[in-house]
Amino acid sequence: MLGSRFLLLALGLLVLVLAEESAEQQVQEPTELEKSGEQLSEEDLIDEQKRTPMQRSSMVRFGRSPMQRSSMVRFGKRSPMQRSSMVRFGKRSPMQRSSMVRFGKRSPMERSAMVRFGRSPMDRSKMVRFGRSSIDRASMVRLGKRTPMQRSSMVRFGKRSMEFEMQSNEKNIEDSE
């Protein structure tokens, strides 16, 4: 009894191994064609579709879908070979970002460089440091240009403003009468 079970198991295992090898060969054939860059002919594609049910189920069992690489191209799933060709033929992929910088398209990296080299408005503290601002407040006081703060203090401390001049004009008129 034990011997016949063992033989059945061995036979079943052998069938499974053979089915896996045949499935591997069928998957490897199209990949070799893809590497050389050739398209499969219509006859080959039709032959793939006419696969026996046993083959399909065994392929699923061993983790391979019945759709092979050649049919993946037809149904729009990308194989590794296609990804590299996408980069070549100008569809945007993450790899191209470095080349975008090279060919002068603006990337986030370049924006920070623009700030560094003064193409974008720098913040005021940097502008004062590099002497680019019109004039900072301390030097404005020195050069006698009025800031809003100075005007209010002038009124407070009795320096001439428009109101003060008007009052003095009225007094002068009264004195002359």
Curated annotation (Swiss-Prot):
State the compartments where it is located. Answer: Secreted
Q: Where is the signal peptide?
A: 1-19
Summed up, the tissue specificity of this protein is:
Expressed in the ASI sensory neurons, the ALA interneuron and the AVG interneuron from where secretion occurs. Expression in the ASI neurons is necessary and sufficient to maintain serotonin-induced fat loss.
**Key word tRNA-binding present:** no
Q: List the disulfide bonds.
A: none
Residues modified as Leucine amide: 143
Q: Does the keyword Metal-binding apply?
A: no
Q: Which InterPro entries match?
A: FMRFamid-related_peptide-like, FMRFamide-related_np
Q: Name one GO molecular function term.
A: neuropeptide receptor binding
Q: Which GO terms describe its cellular component?
A: extracellular space
Q: Where is this region: Disordered?
A: 25-106
Q: Which GO terms describe its biological process?
A: negative regulation of locomotion; neuropeptide signaling pathway
Pro-peptide positions?
A: 20-49, 161-177
* Functional description taken from the UniProt entry: FMRFamide-like neuropeptides. Stimulates serotonin-induced fat loss by binding to and activating the npr-22 receptor which leads to induction of the atgl-1 lipase and subsequent fat loss. Together with atfs-1, negatively regulates the expression of the transcription regulator hlh-11, to promote expression of atgl-1, and thus atgl-1-dependent fat oxidation in response to mitochondrial stress.
Q: Which family does it belong to?
A: Belongs to the FARP (FMRFamide related peptide) family.
- Could you tell me what this protein is called? FMRFamide-like neuropeptides 7
Q: Provide the species name.
A: Caenorhabditis elegans
